[in-house]
């Protein structure tokens, strides 16, 4: 026995444990949390020129982003995320904003200050102001908050005041902020809350550069006005197309619930790996812990924003990371059952499993990349974490896991301890009794997966036809992401009723289309509205529910234009992911396997859609994330099966359909344990997310759970069986010739 390798193993494990204990918490604490985890505000603006005929250029968009960044600083947001999208859109994300009504006003106000006479003729505008010359102060007589500004030219102001003075009795100098064509002083002055800021009477000529703006402000309003004027006017007009706001209490609760769900799920996975795979399972637990740390650390280095779906992706990634370990460990167990030594089985198992793991991960990454390209901001967070998880898990599960296990294997300490790999001694053959065609014992070697394929084809076809009928009758319960409108989520510390929530909205003059209760104690009310309420109405809603229930409601609005775009992008995403997978599988395997795989993937996706239709669960953008995740995961399962088929095809070279049938059946028998164990680990995670996770990812978790179970069926009884029937027909034609 080589004690040096044993000592090296324990030193490495000690080093890893110490490093994880010391560095994991700081890495996790440094990560920037998204809106859905700490509360905040997100809005997608459509950018239009102030003057008709002007064009929105790249320079104009950049200038607008700079102006919005300055305004975000006024709000005290240290790290605003402001991005240009397309040719005429800007997305603004402000995490941690406490007063979202104020944020809305400060962001969208153009801050075009103008001085006009009572007939609305412009006399002065923002160009006449000294840069950064506005400040909030108090009137020396009334002690009311006011804003003082500095003008560039005292003589020009003198001429303006002289002209207005002569217009008595209409000698008002009207100060406007964001005057629009059609606005009228004479109409506004009759209103309780006029649009103009102030309208002082001018009784003498004023040759000065110091001007006071009085408007019955609060101190905060005066301060905001001064800050907006100093930040500079927006060079464009901004129109909200999509918005979502999350109350801080919602975010904190979502973070707590989802992290707790993750801890429970990961702990169960660790116990399963230790129980089923024993020593290799312990290695998997160590490498999975390293995977979690590295993923969080890289996410921090990227300055990426961690969203609720991102945490779900990290937790889901643990379940998927286990897959690489399971594939390798099952291969090692097969080699041990053939009577090989521990060292020989370890080397052979690692060599044979590498291509399978590589192909399975690449196909999942294809789906994740497409998701990143076509997803909304929160879905991009999910896709980023999923891609990062796949790449990191490949490194930890393939290289670190093998390195640590190799230290033990090469020490010769395990030479007589095959049982430590989870192998039953009675299933280990004498190597003298085996040859290249000998197959190891599997728990499912008596199962015939292919003899009833026609019945499964009929069953799958019947389910598809039934699904089409269900969709035609029930259709989908589209969320506002696709149907447009508004969604307002109210949280209370006590049980709510639909009647109570409806009355709350009625008191605000709003008529919700539907009201649904959620949460363990029915303390969350979700109201849907067909139209998109204006900013003033949203402000009233936030104030009302904050005062009544003590927490800000979550408000999301989607315009019809954006709703259609999201629906279109969802279809593009599924189509492009499918095409990408077909191309890759065709290159690595053959086009028949690619087509068979896509048929099973589309069946999975269609089954989930049908399930959501009949259960009336809401379909939103996270639903699309779930669909693409299942596509990536299900192809992973199918790839493992086809990789084993390819291996047997090279070795056995079938000449008849019976030979081909035997190969497919044998491949399914040998990979079924891996399929069950992998699905089980991912299902554990999904179920814990479903039970303990935040309510906002409940439908996402349900879609994943349904897809995972359907994916096992489709991999066994659709993908493999279609390829068998297709390849068998080709084989018969070749033999006939």
Swiss-Prot record:
Up-regulation conditions: Shows maximal expression at the beginning of post-exponential growth phase and increased expression by glucose in the post-exponential growth phase when cells are cultured on rich medium. Expressed constitutively during growth in minimal medium.
Localization annotation: Cell membrane
Chain ranges on the Cytoplasmic side, renumbered to this chain: 1-5, 276-278, 323-353, 402-453, 591-593, 643-677, 721-737
UniProt similarity note: In the N-terminal section; belongs to the SecD/SecF family. SecD subfamily. In the C-terminal section; belongs to the SecD/SecF family. SecF subfamily.
Topology class, membrane: Multi-pass membrane protein
Range of residues in the leader sequence: none
Record Pfam families: Sec_GG, SecD_1st, SecD_SecF_C, SecDF_P1_head
Keyword Phosphoprotein: no
Region (SecF): 446-737
Segments crossing the lipid bilayer: 6-26, 255-275, 279-299, 302-322, 354-374, 381-401, 454-474, 570-590, 594-614, 622-642, 678-698, 700-720
Gene Ontology biological-process entries: intracellular protein transmembrane transport; protein targeting; protein transport; protein transport by the Sec complex
Biological source species: Bacillus subtilis (strain 168)
Gene Ontology, cellular component aspect: plasma membrane
Main subcellular localisation: membrane
Free-text function comment from the UniProt entry: Required for efficient translocation of secretory pre-proteins under conditions of hypersecretion but is not required for the release of mature proteins from the membrane. Part of the Sec protein translocase complex. Interacts with the SecYEG preprotein conducting channel. SecDF uses the proton motive force (PMF) to complete protein translocation after the ATP-dependent function of SecA.
UniProt KW keywords: Cell membrane, Membrane, Protein transport, Translocation, Transmembrane, Transmembrane helix, Transport
GO molecular function, one term: protein-transporting ATPase activity
Complexes and interactors: Part of the essential Sec protein translocation apparatus which comprises SecA, SecYEG and auxiliary protein SecDF. Other proteins may also be involved.
Extracellular side: 27-254, 300-301, 375-380, 475-569, 615-621, 699
Start and end residues of each stretch annotated as SecD: 1-416
Protein name per Swiss-Prot or TrEMBL: Protein translocase subunit SecDF
Mutant lacking the gene: phenotype: Cells lacking this gene show a cold-sensitive phenotype and a filamentous morphology.
């Amino acid at each position: 026995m080589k004690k040096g390798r044993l000592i090296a193993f324990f030193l490495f494990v000690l080093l890893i444990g110490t490093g994880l204990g010391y560095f994991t918490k700081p890495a996790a604490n440094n990560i920037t949390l998204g809106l859905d985890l700490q509360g905040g505000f997100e809005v997608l603006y459509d950018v239009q020129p102030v003057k008709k005929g002007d064009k929105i250029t790249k320079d104009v968009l950049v200038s607008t982003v700079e102006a919005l960044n300055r305004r975000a600083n006024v709000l005290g947001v240290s790290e605003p995320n402001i991005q240009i999208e397309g040719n005429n859109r800007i997305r603004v994300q402000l995490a941690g904003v406490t007063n979202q009504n104020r944020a809305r006003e400060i962001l969208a106000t153009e801050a075009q200050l103008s001085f006009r006479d009572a007939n609305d003729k412009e006399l002065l505008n923002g160009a006449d102001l000294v840069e950064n010359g506005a400040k909030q102060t108090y009137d020396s007589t009334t002690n009311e908050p006011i804003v003082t500004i500095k003008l560039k030219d005292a003589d020009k102001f003198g001429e303006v005041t002289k002209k207005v003075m002569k217009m008595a009795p209409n000698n008002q100098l009207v100060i406007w902020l964001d005057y629009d064509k059609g606005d009228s002083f004479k109409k506004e002055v009759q209103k309780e809350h006029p649009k103009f800021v102030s309208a002082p009477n001018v009784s003498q000529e004023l040759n000065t550069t110091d001007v006071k703006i009085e408007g019955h402000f609060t101190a905060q309003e005066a301060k905001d006005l001064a800050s907006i004027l100093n930040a500079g006017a927006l060079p464009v007009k901004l129109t909200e197309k999509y918005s979502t706001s999350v109350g801080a209490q919602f975010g904190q609760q979502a973070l707590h619930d989802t992290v707790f769900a993750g801890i429970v799920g990961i702990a169960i996975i660790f116990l399963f790996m230790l129980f089923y795979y024993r020593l290799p399972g312990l290695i998997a637990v160590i490498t999975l812990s390293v995977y979690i740390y590295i993923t969080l650390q890289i996410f921090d280095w990227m300055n990426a924003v961690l969203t609720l779906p991102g945490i779900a992706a990290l937790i889901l990634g643990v379940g998927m990371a286990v897959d690489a370990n399971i594939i390798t460990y099952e291969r090692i167990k097969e080699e041990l059952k053939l009577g090989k030594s521990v060292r020989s089985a370890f080397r052979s198992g690692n060599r044979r499993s590498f291509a399978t793991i590589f192909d399975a991960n690449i196909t999942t990454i294809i789906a994740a990349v497409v998701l990143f390209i076509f997803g909304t901001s929160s879905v991009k967070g999910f896709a980023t974490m999923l891609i990062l998880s796949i790449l990191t898990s490949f490194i930890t599960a393939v290289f670190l896991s093998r390195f640590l296990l190799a230290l033990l294997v090469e020490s010769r300490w395990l030479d007589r301890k095959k049982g430590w790999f989870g192998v039953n001694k009675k299933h280990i053959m004498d190597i003298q009794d085996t040859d290249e065609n000998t197959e190891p014992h599997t728990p499912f070697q008596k199962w015939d997966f292919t003899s009833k394929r026609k019945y499964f084809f009929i069953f799958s076809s019947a389910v598809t036809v039934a699904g089409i009928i269900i969709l035609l009758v029930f259709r989908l319960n589209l969320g506002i992401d696709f149907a447009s409108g508004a969604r307002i989520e109210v949280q209370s510390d006590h049980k709510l009723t639909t009647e109570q929530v409806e009355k709350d909205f009625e008191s605000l003059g709003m008529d919700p289309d539907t009201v649904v209760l959620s949460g363990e104690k029915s303390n969350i009310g979700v109201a849907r509205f067909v139209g998109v309420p204006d900013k003033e109405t949203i402000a009233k809603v936030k104030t009302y529910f904050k005062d009544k229930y003590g927490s800000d409601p979550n408000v999301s609005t989607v315009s019809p234009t954006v709703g259609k775009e999201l629906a279109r992008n969802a279809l593009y995403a599924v189509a492009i992911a499918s095409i990408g997978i077909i191309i890759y599988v065709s290159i690595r395997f053959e086009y028949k396997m690619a087509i068979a795989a896509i048929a099973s993937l589309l069946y999975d996706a269609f089954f989930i859609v049908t399930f959501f239709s009949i259960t009336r669960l809401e379909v939103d953008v996270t639903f699309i994330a779930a669909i693409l995740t299942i596509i990536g995961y299900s192809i992973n399962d199918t790839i493992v099966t086809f990789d084993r088929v390819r291996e047997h095809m090279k070795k056995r070279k079938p000449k008849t359909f019976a030979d081909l049938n035997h190969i497919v059946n044998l491949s399914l028998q040998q990979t079924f344990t891996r399929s069950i164990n992998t699905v089980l680990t991912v299902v554990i995670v999904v179920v814990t997310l479903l039970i303990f996770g935040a309510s906002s990812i409940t439908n996402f978790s349900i879609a994943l759970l349904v897809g995972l179970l359907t994916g096992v069926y489709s991999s066994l009884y659709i993908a493999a069986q279609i390829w068998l029937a297709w390849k068998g027909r080709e084989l018969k034609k070749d033999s006939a010739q």
